[in-house]
Amino acid sequence: MTAKWEKTGTNEGKLTFEVGTDKIKEGVDKAFDRTKKQLNVPGFRKGHVPRQIFNKMYGEEALYQDALNIVLPEAYEAAIKEAGIEPVDQPQVDVESMEKGEAWVLSAIVTVKPEVKLGEYKGVKVIKQSTRVTSKEVDEEIEKKREQQAELVLKEGKPAENGDTVTIDFDGSVDGVAFDGGKADNYDLVLGSNSFIPGFEDQLIGHNTDEDVDVNVTFPDDYQAEDLQGKDALFKVKIHEIKTKELPELDDEFAKDVDEDVDSLEDLKVKTKEEIKSRKIQAASDAKETEAVQAAVDNAEIAEIPEAMLNEDVDRQVNQYLANMQQQGISPEMYFQLTGSSEDQLRDQLREGAENRVKTTLVLEAIVEAEKIDPSDDEVAAEIKDLAEQYGMEEKAVRSALSEDMIKHDVAIKSAVELIKDSAIEEPKSKAAKK
């Protein structure tokens, strides 16, 4: 096999390679075996025409296209390996020469992985995130727990306020005409939740049980139902009930109701502080990693990202997003209907971050190569075990679903991320701001 690579653009080139006569013979033989099964030749049973008869009637060249399809994948793989290139898209293959008895000469226009010129990735400067927990944060967290323990009780003789839950019937219309989704009975609405059209909830504040209220609103210009965008609407609303939150007393009994492992309110505060501290430490670690990796990406030079790589990233993101929705019981059709969007709009939305995601992967792969990161068998086995536990699968099933090379690649990328993160230098926010 001889392969020749000629660069014709930033990330594109022409790969010329040969298919030897031995491989051609194998391909032609296989092509004949497939073709003869479909042939009806007088004097022979279907599928049993001798090779020499076929060649005399049709010529061996009639098998060349099928033979090419058979031998091309292996020949192309060998050629890109010999040329030392990494394609990122399907090639455009042309036949340069296909003479009987000689090696076939093929060429392919190939888009390749862009070159990465690494900048500084060790010892990058990042902002040190505070993990200090204030008493105010503890009090706010305790108050959230209190809110979670609150009970809704009927509010009698007093008007609705922000935070109250009202049970209502509503019937909406635009220019006197009803519209889909504009009518409901006995609907529980939390005032101030902003779950309805802007202005709707505000107009119920100050009204009492059994009141009829006319609510006038304007649909936002970006409302999901295009036929309602920017339209004025009138909702006839009947208030059936008003309920308000009744918060529990902030005492030891409340603390024990919230957490059976504590004996007092003070114990709950101590434990809450520890929980907040733990979250902040994790958040600070995540922020350090994100900022350090982004710095390494920003410091690197990549001339141009091939369109094929951007499209592949968007495809992967869309599939993952819709798969996550599916796990929540929401089909793609239902999701697009609920959001009033389309797959094209979702693709446009996810494409915004595609370039940085692809750049990040390219830089991390370049660091893996520069640092000669080569995960051990034990590291790969540990990753398979983690994946099996994460997805509730047998390790054997994980190995079947994912190639070992793919898993090894992911482990290497994680190691590159750890290298960047661990070597990053944290600076106080005030010092970083002065630069």
UniProtKB/Swiss-Prot annotation:
Gene3D superfamilies: 3.10.50.40, Trigger factor ribosome-binding domain (3.30.70.1050), Trigger factor, C-terminal domain (1.10.3120.10). The keyword Cell cycle applies. SUPFAM superfamilies: FKBP-like, Triger factor/SurA peptide-binding domain-like, Trigger factor ribosome-binding domain. GO terms for biological process: 'de novo' cotranslational protein folding; cell division; chaperone-mediated protein folding; protein transport; protein unfolding. It is found in: Cytoplasm. Consists of 3 domains; the N-terminus binds the ribosome, the middle domain has PPIase activity, while the C-terminus has intrinsic chaperone activity on its own. This is Trigger factor.
